[in-house]
UniProtKB/Swiss-Prot annotation:
Gene3D superfamilies: 2-enoyl-CoA Hydratase, Chain A, domain 1 (3.90.226.10). Coiled coil: none annotated. This is Biotin-dependent acetyl-/propionyl-coenzyme A carboxylase beta6 subunit. SUPFAM superfamilies: ClpP/crotonase. GO terms for molecular function: acetyl-CoA carboxylase activity; propionyl-CoA carboxylase activity; transferase activity. Its EC number is 2.1.3.15, 2.1.3.-. The gene is accD6. Pfam families: Carboxyl_trans.
């Protein structure tokens, strides 16, 4: 059953109406309901998103606050069955207070069946959540089980609301602070993208459908046309912090945006989707503006999940590396940096899609291994001419290796001796040439040809796709 465009449905329509929300998401005139409208609290439909057949469901905020009962959950499960059979992406538009209390355990069982359908679809079809109202209680886990979560400004995601938190723990918190988009974008990492408003949330969801389902092909001529001296974006001092995002956008196509995920959570790692020479790619980049670009427990976990997402959907990876190591500290050790850091090693180690590493300035220690190194079977490892590949920086290394020699030197000669030893150490063990000799770097490249080199390496590699679920690490 095809429905009318939103403007033809009637101006008096409640803005929470699921028919209106689905119409705002799908291409005009393409919406076909998958069942008759009812009081179940859910409306599911098929339609197109820029021509891509897509399945979507919307919890109905006008009926019991979108609470999920047996019938509504059945509609969602049926929508998933259709999407899996069609191999179509599925989008959930969420405005729900959780399970229907009046239906008791039956509702809980039905919500669990929705979760099972999501897990069954994981890694097989793209799942995108657009949260436009509450996603509370059991409904909070629906978006969390999907691949990408987009939150509108008025959305709220939490398992227990402020009143329960206050009565149990004594903590006084409002809904926005507890489960608003800024909270989940900065503190919890639940939210991948914060939209400007509800309509922008639908636009972001539509853009994601295109990136996942209209991946395109590498166009070498487009790569050459976009080549510029990206090296100029690095600061002159090798010790100065900088934001890596301009380098990322310079590598990617200028005519399409870079959709960064979880920008404010674990910000020392930048991840997101964009296009390189016409094709969808995933980008991971250390960001020296935050924590000097160090890996820590959260950024390693963030990167690991993103690698597995891209691998599950056959999206090649570009890994931009400028990393001094893992962030030291008691908080990191107690916060699980070993366990969570191992996730990134595992993610790259099992990754099957083409993945190319570019070392721009430095890569040291264990973080060198974790950032898609040759030892983890990177497709190619490129480095700019001044890059360092080492266990640690040369100055720090000689401070350990030649501690006694430096201590014995006259004080007025110590600094010059330290510089001399550091230069010698870098020549032997830390420069790009040494890494080339060993074979852990494939090629030293001119920064002005970065786009062409990355495109060529990814285009020549066999297209592959991992066969695994996308667990929300």
């Amino acid at each position: 059953m095809t429905i009318m465009a939103p403007e033809a449905v009637g101006e008096s329509l409640d803005p929470r109406d699921p028919l209106l929300r689905l119409s705002n998401f799908f291409d005009d005139g393409s919406v076909e309901l998958l069942h008759e409208r009812d009081r179940s609290g859910v409306l599911a439909a098929a339609g197109t998103v820029n021509g891509v057949r897509t399945i979507a469901f919307c919890t109905d905020g006008t009926v019991m606050g979108g609470a999920m009962g047996v019938e509504g959950c059945t509609h969602i499960v049926n929508a998933y069955d259709t999407a899996i059979e069609d191999q179509s992406p599925i989008v959930g538009i969420w405005h729900s207070g959780g399970a229907r209390l009046a239906e008791g355990v039956r509702a809980l069982h039905a919500v669990g069946q929705v979760f099972e359908a999501m897990i069954r679809a994981s890694g097989y079809i793209p799942q995108i959540s657009v949260v436009v109202g509450f996603a509370a209680g059991g409904a909070a886990y629906g978006p969390a089980l999907t691949d990408v979560v987009v939150m509108a400004p008025e959305s709220r995601v939490f398992v227990t609301g402020p009143d329960v938190v206050r009565s149990v723990t004594g903590e006084d918190v409002d809904m926005a602070s507890l489960g608003g988009p800024e909270t989940h974008h900065k503190k919890s990492g639940v939210c991948h993208i914060v939209a400007d408003d509800e309509l922008d949330a639908y636009d972001r969801g539509r853009r994601l459908v295109g990136l996942f389902c209209q991946q395109g092909h590498f166009d070498r001529s487009k790569a050459e046309a976009g080549d510029t001296d990206i090296h100029a974006l690095l600061p002159e001092s090798s010790r100065r912090a900088y934001d890596v995002r301009p380098i990322v956008t310079a590598i990617l196509d200028a005519d399409t945006p870079f959709d960064e995920f979880q920008a404010n959570w674990a910000p020392s790692m930048v991840v997101g989707l964009g296009r390189l020479s016409g094709r969808t790619v995933g980008v991971l980049a250390n960001n020296p503006l935050r924590l000097g670009g160090c890996l820590n427990s959260e950024s390693a976990e963030k990167a690991a999940r993103f690698v597995r997402l891209c691998d599950a959907f056959g999206i090649p990876l570009v890994v931009v590396v400028d990393v001094p190591g893992y962030l030291p500290g008691v908080d990191q050790e107690w916060g699980g940096v070993v366990r969570r850091g191992a996730k990134l090693l595992h993610a790259f180690g099992e990754c099957t899609v083409p993945r190319v590493t570019l070392v721009t300035r430095k890569t040291y220690g264990g973080a060198y291994i974790a950032m898609n190194s040759r030892s983890l079977n990177a497709t190619k490892v490129f480095a700019w001419p001044d890059a360092e590949v080492a266990v640690m920086g040369a100055k720090a290394a000689v401070g350990i290796l030649h501690k006694k020699k430096l201590a014995a030197a006259p004080e007025h000669e110590r600094e010059a001796l330290h510089d001399q030893l550091a230069a010698e150490h870098e020549r032997i063990a830390g420069g790009v040439d040494s890494a080339l000799d060993i074979g852990v770097v494939d090629e030293k490249i001119d920064p002005a040809h970065t786009r062409s080199k990355l495109t060529e390496a990814l285009a020549q590699a066999p297209a592959r796709r991992g066969r695994h679920k996308n667990i929300p690490l």
